[in-house]
Amino acid sequence: MVKTVNGEPLRHRPLQFNDIERVTEVSLLAFSDSATWKWRFKGMSSETMKALTMQLTRDAYFDPHVTCIVAYTDSNPYVGFLAFKKFPPDPNVSYRDWILKSLNKYYSNFLYWWYGAQIVQKRFHYNELQYGAALYKTGLLKNPKGFIHIHFVCVDPALQGNGVGGYLLDMAHDLADEYQIPCFLMASKMAFKMYEHLGYKTSVIANLVDEDTGELIRESPGMIREPKQPSSHET
């Protein structure tokens, strides 16, 4: 059955470089009320916030191990966005991909310097450490078959509630079911119920605390979806 949004078929395609700015705009709208995002960019201008969020999208685009998907309709080329990675990643990376990822890393460091946003870079690094510790506690890193890490999913706020998030996530879920491996993500408050509906269960809680002030920013649930078992006629 074809998924529709406002009567139009919902489709998807790989993220292209020229999509990065528009996808970033959707991301900023989708997470405008996120306490985590407000903390990450606290004290920064809207211009800086957009520039650095665009760089996050570039980071995903230039990572050869990350799958980036854009959902769209005939009238709206940017309905939603998904980025995920299969772990452990394929160790075979082309020289071209390695060079592009390395150059992007240098450019990322330049941007933080250019915008005087080293504190934002520090917060992101600290955030990654907290989420990484949460992932370690799940035991998934020791899973011999691996797992799929959902890095990012967002939907245009005007179109949320139409099943777009589930549509995007099903692409990762289908791959997980094929390999019979779990999916892991850190849930946003706004999408928590959707993740539960899709079969995710809370496995761990990461307490995101401001390293400088000691303020508790958010208790972030780390959630796991176990793969669906193949039906008898598929085995």
UniProtKB/Swiss-Prot annotation:
PROSITE patterns: GNAT. GO terms for molecular function: acyltransferase activity, transferring groups other than amino-acyl groups. It is found in: Golgi apparatus membrane; Endoplasmic reticulum membrane. Gene3D superfamilies: 3.40.630.30. The keyword Acyltransferase applies. Keywords: Acyltransferase, Endoplasmic reticulum, Golgi apparatus, Membrane, Transferase. Residues 82-221 form the N-acetyltransferase domain. It holds the Pfam family Acetyltransf_10. Its EC number is 2.3.1.-. Transmembrane segments: none annotated. GO terms for cellular component: endoplasmic reticulum; endoplasmic reticulum membrane; Golgi apparatus; Golgi membrane. It is a peripheral membrane protein. InterPro entries: Acyl_CoA_acyltransferase, GNAT_dom, Trichothecene_AcTrans. Belongs to the acetyltransferase family. This is Uncharacterized N-acetyltransferase C56E4.07.
